[in-house]
């Protein structure tokens, strides 16, 4: 056990506890073109007999009937306060309650994201240059059994160095750290532990872990992409490996239509390989100036890639 343990006591009618480990409340903000207003779509899953769910956002409460274990409603939000990265990471809070007394709540942010081959990452309609680091949830003497103290220290280090983004490598991290990313405005890349070597017998495991990653973390405004794998061709490439990535890619799009997919390729993989272009965004782990070569070789590599694939979004 390397995460906090909670004992949950709920009435017979309660928000679903077995929906892939998610809180039972999903929130999807849809902003207007001018970013001034938004429709906030809320969905809740219920176990047991419940007639309705009361959703509360600010001073407004909407009641929605429960049909086949699910209730949903839409709020109209005026004068939207954007979640704007490290500049202004504003969070809204929504609560859902049942007549039985059970309640859940979730933070969310209103923001738009896009990726452009020329302008890079676009946050709320403007280019937003991403500079940061990959973070492992690990400490000497603790392994990955980190407490809030260590999570806070890692976030403080990222902020001290001026980072505005973090890749959460290479597995699902603690909810507390995703919350910190939301709070402090760090743009996050979240991914599953599918690394270096493809194991055909592990397909069900990868699909299960991706489902849990997306469903559990859907509400976090800091997360802008889902990572399919890391340097997965390090031990070779097979048709089954490619097929598994197609399944993962399709699964992400099915579970979440609001975020793109990505994967980090090992630097030995040919930049014209079809696998490079399977996810929505491609990325490379280049080691020039670290393991091999000189730092300025990174510039030459990306210039060549962009010349050959001018419409492809690429990250380092």
Tell me what each language-model feature is.
Residues 279-287:
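Structural signature of the urease/amidohydrolase superfamily beta/alpha-barrel
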Residues 142-146, 172, 197-204, 236-240, ...:
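Alpha-helix capping and helix-loop boundary segments enriched in small/acidic/polar residues
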Residues 1-180, 184-188, 209-212, 222-228, ...:
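Secreted/periplasmic carbohydrate-active enzymes, especially glycoside hydrolases
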Residues 274-275, 287-316:
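Glycoside hydrolase catalytic-domain groove-lining segments
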Residues 220, 255-256, 273-276:
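Acidic-histidine catalytic/liganding microenvironments
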């Amino acid at each position: 056990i390397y995460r906090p343990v909670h004992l949950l006591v709920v009435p017979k009618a309660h928000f679903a506890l077995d929906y892939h480990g998610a809180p039972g409340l999903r929130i999807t903000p849809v902003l207007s073109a001018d970013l001034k207003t938004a429709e906030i779509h809320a969905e809740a899953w219920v176990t047991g007999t419940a007639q309705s769910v009361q959703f509360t956002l600010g001073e407004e409460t909407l009641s929605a009937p429960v049909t086949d274990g699910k209730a949903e409603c839409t709020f109209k939000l005026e004068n939207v306060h954007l979640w704007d990265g490290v500049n202004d990471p504003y969070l809204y809070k929504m609560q859902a309650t049942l007549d039985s007394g059970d309640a859940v709540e979730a933070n969310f942010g209103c923001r738009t994201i896009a990726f452009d081959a020329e302008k890079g990452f676009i946050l709320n309609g403007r280019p937003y240059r991403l500079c940061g680091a990959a973070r492992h949830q690990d400490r000497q003497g603790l392994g990955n059994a980190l407490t809030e103290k260590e999570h806070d220290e890692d976030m403080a280090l990222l902020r001290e160095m001026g980072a505005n983004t973090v890749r959460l490598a290479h597995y699902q991290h603690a909810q507390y750290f995703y919350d910190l990313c939301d709070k402090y405005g760090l743009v996050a890349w979240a991914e599953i532990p599918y690394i270096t070597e493809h194991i055909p017998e592990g397909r069900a495991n990868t699909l299960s872990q991706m489902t849990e990653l997306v469903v559990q973390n859907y509400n976090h405004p800091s997360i802008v992409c889902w990572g399919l794998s890391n340097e997965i061709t390090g031990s070779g490439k097979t048709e089954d490996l490619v097929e598994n990535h197609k399944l993962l890619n399709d699964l992400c799009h099915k579970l979440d239509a609001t975020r793109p997919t990505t994967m980090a390729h090992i630097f030995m993989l040919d930049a014209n390989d079809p696998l490079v272009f399977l996810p929505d965004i491609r990325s490379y782990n280049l080691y020039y100036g670290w393991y091999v070569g000189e730092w300025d070789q990174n510039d030459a590599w990306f210039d060549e890639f962009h010349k050959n694939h001018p419409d492809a979004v690429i990250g380092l």
